[in-house]
């Protein structure tokens, strides 16, 4: 106990009528359990960044990024999984020794997160590359399959993946059946709008595999259906229950303010509407905000100063305020989690399809030297979250 605290206690006893003003501000940090509220981060690039020379620091000291995120309050780490991303090797010259975001790489990340006591969200893209609202291309191995054979492939791939993770002690606590599947997934067969019955048939194959894999595991993954942007979510889910899409646990959505028509201050209303209408938990699976308009390398950043919110400058304080206020909005609406997307995608010699380095270094929780910045601290703030 601090000496100042002891003195204050003695004065309080001797002069009980005096109002006490503590000299030391109490520690306001709060660490949450993922079952209460997921304080999440997508760290899918981290293994590749480390392999390609990236260094993470905290207070000037080199540190394992998984340790950093755990110490700053993260309780759930998200990883994307591609089927056969051979391009992640051939994008290098000479080709890299191994693929990234394939099963082996993802298992490595899951075990690293698990070693720090964090839960995991596994994001099946059901593609060899990025799957999002603009592109949902099935793996090359599944080309030309009938809808029935495609469902079998989805089921067997999902089941086999989770069974292998279970055997490795890496069963995830959360599993996404697809990534930002606004148009559907594994197109054209799995089109949400023009082939709704086939879409439900296919995604239920993924869901059944997740349930079957969890039957013999002590970890029962919660199933997430993930849509991009809150304004799209209600219409997307409306009517699907009657079509047979019911067996999932969480509605997840991406919230990128620069591409959304929904103001930050209205997020709680959307979360509450979805939660009460569909009787599911609700999470934000992806979000971000810049701490600078600068660039650490020659890879052009995706977000610039023209895409800022009034009252949230592209500064360390502005990024922190955005993450804090958005988390408070989710909690106020009864939501159960938030994930920052790739907040550790610092510059390095890592390559993707478009460049070397990072097109996201202005949005990370690290400065251009790799040191943690204030934005990462939002996870241990106190929020009105049900115990």
Predicted regions and their residues:
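Bacterial Sec-dependent N-terminal signal peptides
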Residues: 2, 15-31
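Boundary/entry segment of secreted carbohydrate-active catalytic domains
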Residues: 25-68
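Surface-exposed, active-site-proximal loop segments in enzymatic domains
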Residues: 49-56, 83-106, 128-151, 183-193, ...
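Aromatic-lined substrate-binding rim segments of carbohydrate-active enzymes
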Residues: 61-141, 195-221, 264-277
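Glycoside hydrolase catalytic-domain groove-lining segments
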Residues: 63-66, 212, 216-222, 231-307, ...
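Active-site cleft segment of glycoside hydrolase catalytic domains centered on the general acid/base Glu
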Residues: 101-105, 132-241, 246, 261-269, ...
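Aromatic-rich peripheral "rim/lid" segments of glycoside hydrolase catalytic domains that contact
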Residues: 273, 292-325, 329, 333-334, ...
């Amino acid at each position: 106990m601090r000496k100042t605290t002891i003195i204050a206690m003695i004065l309080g006893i001797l002069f009980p009528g005096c109002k006490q003003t503590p000299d030391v501000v109490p520690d306001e940090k709060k660490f949450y359990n993922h079952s209460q509220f997921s304080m999440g981060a997508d760290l899918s690039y981290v293994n590749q960044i480390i392999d390609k020379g990236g260094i993470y620091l905290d207070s000037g000291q080199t540190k394992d990024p998984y340790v950093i995120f755990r110490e700053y309050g993260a309780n759930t780490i998200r990883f994307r999984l591609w089927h056969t991303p051979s391009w992640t090797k051939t994008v290098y010259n000479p080709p890299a020794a191994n693929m990234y975001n394939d099963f082996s790489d993802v298992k490595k990340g899951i075990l690293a997160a698990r070693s720090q006591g964090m839960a995991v969200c596994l994001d099946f893209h059901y593609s060899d590359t990025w799957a999002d609202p603009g592109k949902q291309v099935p793996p090359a191995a599944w080309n030309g399959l009938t809808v029935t054979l495609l469902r079998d492939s989805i089921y067997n791939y999902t089941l086999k993946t989770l069974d292998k993770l279970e055997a490795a002690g890496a069963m995830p606590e959360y599993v996404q059946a697809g990534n930002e599947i606004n148009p559907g997934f594994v197109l054209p067969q799995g089109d949400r709008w023009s082939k709704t019955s086939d879409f439900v048939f296919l995604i239920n194959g993924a869901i059944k595999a997740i349930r079957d894999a969890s039957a013999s595991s002590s970890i029962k993954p919660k199933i997430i259906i993930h849509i991009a942007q809150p304004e799209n979510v209600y219409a997307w889910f409306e009517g699907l229950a009657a079509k047979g899409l019911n067996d999932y646990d969480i509605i997840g959505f991406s919230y990128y303010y620069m591409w959304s028509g929904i103001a930050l201050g209205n997020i709680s209303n959307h979360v509450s509407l979805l939660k009460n209408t569909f009787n599911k938990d609700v999470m934000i699976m992806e979000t971000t905000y810049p701490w600078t308009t600068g660039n650490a390398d020659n890879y052009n950043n995706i977000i610039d100063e023209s895409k800022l919110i009034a009252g949230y400058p592209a500064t360390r304080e502005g990024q922190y305020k955005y993450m804090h206020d958005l988390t408070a909005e989710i909690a106020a609406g009864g939501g159960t989690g938030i994930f920052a997307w790739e907040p550790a995608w610092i510059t390095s010699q890592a390559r993707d399809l478009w460049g070397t380095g990072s097109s996201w270094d202005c949005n990370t929780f690290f400065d251009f030297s790799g040191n943690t910045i204030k934005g990462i601290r939002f996870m241990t703030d106190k929020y009105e979250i049900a115990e």
